[in-house]
Structure formats: structure tokens, C-alpha cells
């Protein structure tokens, strides 16, 4: 039986307040586990409009109807409306995920600021952002986070090292084909990376005739084999208009015989000694604008 680890990125105040409760209900109906990764500071979603000048961004917006999924109010945060503090205004919604038995971790402090800046920032800036997120998580939950999953799959060397410094055993900060030990400047880090292996729904919708009505079928076609996977979903999407597609995925994965686990559940079944050691790299992913953290394909016998 293969395991599919479900990783929920929660980017916005609306996603935290509205999407998370809906996802909890869907997951509980399916007896599925998942890891919720929270944005813990200000919601500056409106600042993301600056990405309109990046190659591929407008095409993605047109394919996935950002306004319908995020709402006008969210798109005004940081532009025409002040940015709300998610960790202050929606702490109870975050704790509800933990109280329902779901693994919780850090997504970021400020989603837009992290995604748009971390690649070129230094260790001091990175440490400051991550410390803000860590401290707020501890304030909200009364305990340290279990794991980390970077906003927009954007990282730098200092961020990977900070995960080691926190003592986290595993994280999910990039894209790839399977678990690996990340290597920075020739040195293997202590934690295991569990990269997202499957395309997200918004990467598939609008391509090759795929829409919200058949996207679940398209994705299920990629999970027929008995192979572990990591799937990233978003509270704003699968916890909103794409909820029917997500429910169809949950049913389909059960029918395929897969176990639906959280990141911790996937990590628990790994033999660290058999994992490849791979350098951190950047690359493009179909349906996603810009470059992301990617794991090079492991060569046979790589360690």
C-alpha cells in the first residue's frame, strides 16, 4: 500500500478562517490525515499583484480565477486595506486543526514577503523572518512546530540550515520525486526533505482540457502506481471552490488502496540510510510561474 502525504498550505486570513474548517470536515469524513502549514503574520496578499510583470504569472491567473478563489477583500490587503495579522485574528482556527488531531507546522511569517524575497536575501533577514514565524507558532499553539513547508517552494541556504537548528527531523520545502537528504555546499544536512511530488490542482486546471470538473480524474491517473507521494493543497482552493474536486480525490485515493497520511506519517516509514543525498537546486515546474526549489533526479547509488 502506497502512502500519499497531504500537505495543506494556508496562505491567507480567509483561508485560515474559512478554508481550514472545511478541509477539516472533508478530511475527517475520509478518515484522512494531513499536515497544516500556517502563515502566521501579516496577510499582504495584495502585494502579489506586482507579480503581474513576471513571465507566466498572468497566464496562471487567467487559468485559475484568482479573484473567485481568494475574494476581492483578500486581494486588497496591503494595497487598499491594511494587512490583518493572521496569527492574532485566526489563532482559534489554527488550534482547531491541532485539536482535531492534525499535524501542524510553519508555512511562513508573511507569505508574499517570503515568496518574493527569500531567494536573494541573506542569513540575517532569513533568520528574522523564520524566528517571527517560530515564536508566533509557539504563542498560538503553546508548543514548537513539528515541521516547515516554505511559501511558494522558495528557500535559501540559511533557511535550510535553520530547519536543522530547530531540530526538525523533516520538512517539505520544494518539489521533487521522493524523499532525500538536502546538501548545501557539499555538506549533507540533518533533516529529511519530503518534496511535493504531484502537481497541484491549480497547476493542472486550464491545461490539456482540464477543468475543475475533471481535474480529480486527471490527478488520479498519476497515482495509480504503488508509489509514495506528497500532494500539496491550499486552504483557499480545496477549502473553497475546489472542495468537490478534493473530495473526489480523497475517495479516489481510497479506492486505489492508498493510505492518506501526514508528513510525519510518511517520514516514520522511511529508512534514512537508503535516502539519496542531493544538492539543492532551482528549476521550473509546469503550470507554475518562476523557479522553485527542486531536487535533482537521484542517480543510481547516489548517497
Spans of features found by a protein language model:
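Positively charged, amphipathic and often flexible ligand-engagement surfaces
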Residues: 193-208
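Active-site clefts of carbohydrate-active enzymes
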Residues: 201, 233-236
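Catalytic alpha-helical scaffold of carbohydrate-active enzymes acting on polysaccharides/glycoconjugates
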Residues: 1-147, 152-192, 210-231, 239-303
Amino acid at each position: 500500500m502506497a502512502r500519499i502525504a497531504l500537505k495543506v498550505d494556508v496562505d491567507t486570513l480567509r483561508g485560515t478562517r474559512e478554508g481550514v474548517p472545511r478541509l477539516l470536515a472533508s478530511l475527517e469524513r475520509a478518515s484522512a490525515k494531513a499536515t497544516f502549514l500556517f502563515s502566521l503574520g501579516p496577510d499582504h496578499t495584495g502585494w502579489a499583484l506586482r507579480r503581474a510583470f513576471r513571465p507566466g504569472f498572468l497566464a496562471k491567473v487567467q487559468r485559475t480565477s484568482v479573484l473567485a478563489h481568494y475574494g476581492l477583500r483578500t486581494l486588497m490587503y496591503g494595497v487598499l486595506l491594511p494587512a490583518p495579522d493572521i496569527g492574532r485574528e485566526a489563532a482559534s482556527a489554527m488550534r482547531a486543526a491541532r485539536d482535531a488531531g492534525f499535524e501542524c507546522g510553519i508555512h511562513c511569517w508573511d507569505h508574499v514577503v517570503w515568496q518574493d524575497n527569500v531567494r536573494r536575501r541573506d542569513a540575517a533577514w532569513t533568520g528574522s523572518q523564520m524566528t517571527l514565524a517560530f515564536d508566533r507558532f509557539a504563542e498560538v499553539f503553546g508548543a514548537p512546530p513539528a515541521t516547515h513547508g516554505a511559501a511558494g517552494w522558495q528557500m535559501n541556504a540559511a533557511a535550510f540550515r535553520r530547519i536543522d537548528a530547530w531540530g526538525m527531523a523533516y520538512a517539505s520545502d520544494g518539489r521533487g520525486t521522493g524523499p532525500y537528504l538536502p546538501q548545501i555546499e557539499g555538506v549533507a544536512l540533518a533533516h529529511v526533505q519530503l518534496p511535493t511530488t504531484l502537481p497541484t490542482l491549480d497547476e493542472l486546471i486550464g491545461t490539456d482540457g482540464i477543468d475543475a470538473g475533471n481535474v480529480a480524474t486527471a490527478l488520479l491517473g498519476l497515482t495509480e502506481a504503488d508509489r509514495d507521494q506528497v500532494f500539496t493543497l491550499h486552504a483557499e482552493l480545496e477549502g473553497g471552490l475546489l472542495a468537490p474536486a478534493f473530495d473526489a480525490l480523497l475517495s479516489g485515493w481510497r479506492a486505489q488502496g492508498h493510505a492518506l497520511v501526514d508528513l510525519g506519517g510518511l517520514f516514520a516509514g522511511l529508512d534514512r540510510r537508503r535516502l539519496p543525498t542531493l544538492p539543492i537546486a532551482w528549476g521550473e515546474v509546469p503550470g507554475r510561474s518562476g523557479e522553485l526549489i527542486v531536487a535533482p533526479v537521484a542517480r543510481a547509488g547516489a548517497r
